[in-house]
């Protein structure tokens, strides 16, 4: 018998097991760039401690080449044991090389990073290796999170569209709008803070958080949508800056501006005045200047984080100054030469603007009864929401932050609260400042009211939008590079970036998307698309926090304590509701795009286990289901076969084949429509400490083989002194509760007599007895080499030789075979064995009634024992019907028994086999041989053309020779090409009742 019978790990019993050296403990390789690495001088045997102390530590210079291969580890270990170099260490018992210090913590972190299931739990190992990490300036909370968030939030919408929103929706609905969107971003910020403070965070921002919480498929799909949202948002900001510039400097236009004449501007349902002329920049001017500005911003982004950090204050300070100038102008209005619409802060104006005035507008946003666009609250929601979508700007740069767990919550929350308060205050101020006509027709009302000059606001608008565009063009490439570095989608490999380097290829791709959207040139067409992508990302962050908070796994310990799963759930629902309120069409399109990416990642993506929340949910669901099943017996209606597939207990297969190729096909035949679980087990003979690594390697190989054969199951490899002992451990301990395997499946040992493997009978009988004792059913397959696959359709009959009560297992197996394409054209025949002829008709009627009640269609044939006495029909000319077969079996058994008796007499001990005392009853041996011979002849007579034969397995007689039992089984199965020998257990698996 092979050692373990498992590919690559087995050997023949004739070979003496080679003694292996004791495994040496391995330690982390000391890197040459580790600073302050101390090499303790080895203390020679017999030397004093003082001498060792005088020698002192030797400091290794960085860059010294250190050999750390296995031979060096073995030598160092031997040196410790022989020379006692660590003999005086207080922690020698724990097996550490040196005392616990900060270097030990570095090793712990390094080992966790290497042991992660993904190639990069945030970093791509294949990229980082061989490329020294560049020194990168780390950012604090102010410059790394607060400033980017503020720049993204205070964008074009506030300056150009916010006064118009107040005029269209009225003061009270504008307050509801701002509070509604602010609640969504606030709850998302709470969820973001909780997840970001639950451990170290790598590059990728929200993608990293969602991917590690909801899995790589969801993370990549939402991450790519969020990347597109950032790239398109950059185009929106660029267009806003260009539009403002052309309004402020009309002489810079290359093409003639578009002029819109509105005959009657309707305000509060009445015409407000005469014809109004509205001038808007030409589309081609927007395209030309937009492309130029995008290219200039890309040059800044190519300069890296250092240049961006230097440029960012230059963009933000004028923005804050311009907002201050707007507030000053509001409080001192109206000034001389002010517009006729500006009334100054007035309660009367506030009352007039309190209610909404939704109406039709033209493409320029001017009220027009013949306009093509009708506005309502939902439409305003889609227009305004991009003004609050900058809360992820700081987390997008998580790889560049000094302390992500402190900076992201504080910076993002302060930016969210401050801007929301500013928006709420602005609603009151603008509503009390100007008439509704001015709010709806003057797009740059903020500039008109600003002190001391509109030029301040023009500069603020341009710089704010350029700053927001710069942040978008900075965060989007890093997000795409983080997705590519995770190595989930091979198609994104072009966008990978080395650790510490700039994602130049991703920046070029982002610029291409941004320029493509700039060419569209319509700001109101771009904003709904951005809104959907950002809301999808926010919903993903909230769902991630909801799942992690609800499951409350031991690893869920966020430093940010102000969170609850109900808040995250409300935030996620708010995001979904806002998406459908804005536009169900855009919502369906965005969800369809995310679903397509999810499907593509699941098909083409590389598998990665990031410990996501779904795995924890599956685990807790499995525990709940297991507890709900209890320890009671499973009702026959709920009984599922859980086969324990015993791989390669005997038989020689190629070393690279972990189990018989057809075992997986047979396991699939035992499950209806793939429902159920199979457990593939194998045993490696030997000592556990010596063969543990071999078992792990074999288990991985077997798992891969199961997946290759498309069989739903798990693999288990154990190490035991022998196959019998190993199987006994498996049959007692495998499984949990009612999810324990209930059927043991193995091949019939057809080679035992051919190769004279005399130890197989004892193992075979031991396995069957263990199954009977453990109340497990047994299915032994002969003819596995000829078992059909799913493409080989069979025609004929499935014959059952029902001899003993087995709980209906044989009947159920035959019905399961019929559910497979290979056997669906077959018919079932049930052969019942009767003792007397008088019982035949009664037995046939009972079996037919029983099968009818079981909803099973089968032909019933009764065979009596007396018919065995007649000479068999020899028309087939089979050699099995010749008495020579019977005499050969008798001769082999007599020879074997005589050898056992001679050994017992020679050693003066009782008759023993396999270490157990046995009793030889030659009359029973003759009787059992004859029974098997006649049963085999009956099977050949009636089922010679059967596709599969199922027959009851006789239990091994107590204190009987295993060799004799093996001879009985050989007589039973000989010349039958494909047979299943089935032993049921003391439990019904079929029921008559509904």
Swiss-Prot record:
The keyword Nucleotide-binding does not apply. Glycans are attached at residues 268, 274, 337, 353, 370. The chain crosses the membrane at residues 140-160, 175-195, 222-242, 288-308, 312-332, 373-393, 413-433, 449-469, 506-526, 530-552, 559-579, 586-606. GO terms for biological process: potassium ion transport. Residues 161-174, 243-287, 333-372, 434-448, 527-529, 580-585 are extracellular. Residues 1-139, 196-221, 309-311, 394-412, 470-505, 553-558, 607-994 are cytoplasmic. GO terms for cellular component: membrane. InterPro entries: AA-permease/SLC12A_dom, SLC12_C, SLC12A_fam. Keywords: Glycoprotein, Ion transport, Membrane, Potassium, Potassium transport, Symport, Transmembrane, Transmembrane helix, Transport. One of its GO terms (molecular function) is chloride:monoatomic cation symporter activity. It is found in: Membrane. Signal peptide: none annotated. It is a multi-pass membrane protein. Residues 1-28 are annotated as: Disordered. Gene3D superfamilies: Amino acid/polyamine transporter I (1.20.1740.10). Belongs to the SLC12A transporter family. Probable cation/chloride cotransporter. This is Cation-chloride cotransporter 2. It comes from Oryza sativa subsp. japonica. The gene is CCC2.
């Amino acid at each position: 018998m092979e050692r373990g019978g498992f590919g690559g790990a087995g050997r023949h019993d004739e070979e003496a097991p080679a003694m292996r050296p004791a495994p040496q403990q391995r330690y982390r390789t000391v890197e040459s760039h580790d600073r302050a690495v101390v090499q303790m001088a080895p203390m020679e045997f017999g030397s004093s401690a003082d001498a060792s102390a005088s020698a002192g530590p030797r400091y290794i210079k960085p860059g010294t080449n250190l050999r750390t291969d296995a031979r060096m580890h073995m030598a160092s270990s031997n040196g410790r044991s022989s020379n006692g170099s660590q003999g005086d260490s207080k922690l020698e018992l724990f097996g550490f090389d040196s005392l616990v210090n900060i270097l030990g913590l570095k090793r712990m972190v390094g080992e966790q990073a290497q042991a992660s299931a993904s190639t990069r739990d945030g970093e791509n190992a294949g990229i980082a290796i061989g490329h020294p990490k560049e020194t990168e300036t780390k950012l604090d909370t102010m410059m790394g999170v607060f400033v980017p968030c503020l720049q993204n939030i205070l964008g074009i919408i506030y300056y150009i569209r916010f006064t118009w929103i107040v005029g269209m929706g009225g003061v009270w609905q504008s307050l509801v709008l701002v509070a509604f969107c602010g609640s969504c971003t606030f709850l998302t910020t709470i969820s973001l803070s909780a997840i970001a403070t639950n451990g170290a965070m790598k590059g990728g921002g929200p993608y990293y958080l969602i991917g590690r919480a909801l899995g790589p498929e969801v993370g990549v799909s939402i991450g790519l949508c969020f990347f597109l949202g950032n790239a398109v948002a950059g185009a929106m900001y660029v267009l806003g800056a260009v539009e403002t510039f052309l309004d402020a400097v009309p002489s810079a236009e290359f093409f003639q501006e578009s002029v819109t004449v509105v005959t009657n501007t309707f305000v509060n349902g009445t015409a407000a005045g005469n014809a109004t002329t509205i001038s808007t920049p030409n589309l081609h001017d927007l395209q030309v200047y937009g492309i130029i500005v995008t290219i200039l911003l890309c040059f800044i982004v190519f300069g890296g984080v250092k240049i961006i950090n230097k440029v960012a204050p230059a963009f933000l300070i004028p923005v804050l100054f311009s907002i201050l100038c707007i507030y000053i102008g509001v409080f001192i209005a109206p000034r001389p030469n002010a517009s006729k619409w500006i009334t100054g802060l007035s309660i009367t104006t506030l009352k007039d603007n309190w209610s909404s005035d939704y109406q039709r507008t033209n493409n320029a946003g001017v009220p027009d009864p013949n306009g093509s666009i009708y506005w309502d609250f939902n439409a305003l929601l889609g227009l305004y929401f991009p003004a609050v979508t900058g809360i992820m700007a700081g987390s997008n740069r998580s790889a560049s932050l000094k302390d992500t767990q402190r900076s992201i919550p504080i910076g993002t929350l302060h930016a969210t609260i401050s801007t929301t308060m500013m928006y709420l205050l602005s609603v009151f101020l603008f509503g009390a400042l100007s008439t509704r006509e001015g709010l709806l027709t003057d797009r740059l009302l903020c500039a008109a009211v600003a002190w001391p000059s509109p030029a301040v606001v023009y500069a603020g608008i341009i710089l704010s939008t350029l700053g927001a565009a710069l942040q978008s063009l900075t965060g989007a490439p890093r997000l795409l590079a983080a997705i590519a570095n995770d190595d989930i989608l091979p198609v994104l490999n072009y966008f990978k970036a080395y650790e510490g380097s700039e994602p130049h290829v991703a920046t070029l791709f982002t610029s291409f998307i941004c320029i493509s959207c700039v060419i569209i040139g319509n700001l109101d067409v771009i904003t709904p698309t951005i809104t959907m992508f950002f809301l999808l990302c926010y919903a993903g962050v909230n769902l991630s926090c909801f799942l992690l908070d609800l499951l409350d796994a031991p690893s869920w310990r966020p430093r940010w304590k102000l969170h609850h799963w109900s808040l995250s759930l409300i935030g996620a629902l708010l995001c979904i509701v806002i998406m459908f309120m804005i536009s169900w069409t855009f919502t369906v399109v965005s969800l369809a795009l995310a679903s397509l990416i999810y499907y593509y990642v699941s098909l083409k993506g590389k598998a990665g286990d990031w410990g996501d929340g779904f795995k924890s949910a599956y685990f807790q669901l499995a525990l709940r289901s297991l507890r709900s099943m209890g320890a009671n017996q499973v009702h026959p209606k709920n009984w599922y076969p859980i086969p324990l597939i015993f791989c390669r207990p005997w038989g020689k297969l190629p070393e690279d084949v972990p189990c018989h190729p057809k075992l997986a096909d047979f396991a699939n035949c035992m499950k209806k429509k793939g429902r159920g679980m199979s457990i593939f087990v194998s045993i490696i003979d030997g000592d556990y400490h010596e063969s543990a690594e071999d078992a792990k390697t074999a288990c991985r190989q077997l798992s891969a083989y199961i997946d290759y054969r498309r069989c739903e199951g798990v693999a288990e490899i154990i190490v035991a002194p022998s196959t019998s002992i190993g199987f006994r451990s498996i049959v007692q301990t495998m499984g949990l509760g009612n999810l324990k395997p209930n059927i043991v499946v193995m091949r019939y040992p057809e080679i035992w007599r051919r190769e004279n493997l005399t130890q197989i009978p004892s193992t075979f009988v031991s396995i069957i007895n263990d199954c009977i004792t453990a109340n497990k059913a047994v299915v032994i397959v002969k003819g596995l080499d000829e078992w059909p696959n799913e493409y080989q359709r069979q025609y004929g009959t499935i014959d059952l030789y029902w001899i003993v009560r087995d709980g209906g297992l044989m009947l159920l197996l035959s019905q399961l075979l019929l559910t497979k394409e290979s056997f669906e054209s077959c018919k079932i025949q049930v052969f019942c064995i009767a003792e007397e002829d008088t019982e035949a008709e009664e037995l046939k009627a009972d079996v037919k009634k029983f099968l009818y009640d079981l909803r099973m269609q089968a032909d019933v044939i009764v065979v009596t024992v007396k018919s065995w006495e007649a000479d068999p029909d020899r028309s087939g000319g089979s050699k099995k019907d010749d008495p020579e077969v019977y005499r050969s079996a008798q001769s082999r058994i007599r020879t074997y028994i005589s050898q056992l008796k001679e050994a017992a007499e020679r050693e003066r001990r009782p008759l023993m086999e396999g270490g157990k005392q046995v009793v030889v009853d030659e009359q029973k041996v003759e009787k059992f041989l004859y029974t098997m011979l006649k049963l085999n002849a009956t099977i050949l007579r009636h089922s010679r053309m059967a596709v599969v034969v199922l027959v009851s397995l006789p239990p091994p007689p107590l204190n009987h020779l295993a060799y004799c039992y093996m001879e009985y089984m050989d007589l039973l199965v000989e010349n039958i090409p494909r047979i299943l020998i089935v032993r049921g257990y003391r439990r019904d698996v079929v029921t008559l009742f509904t």
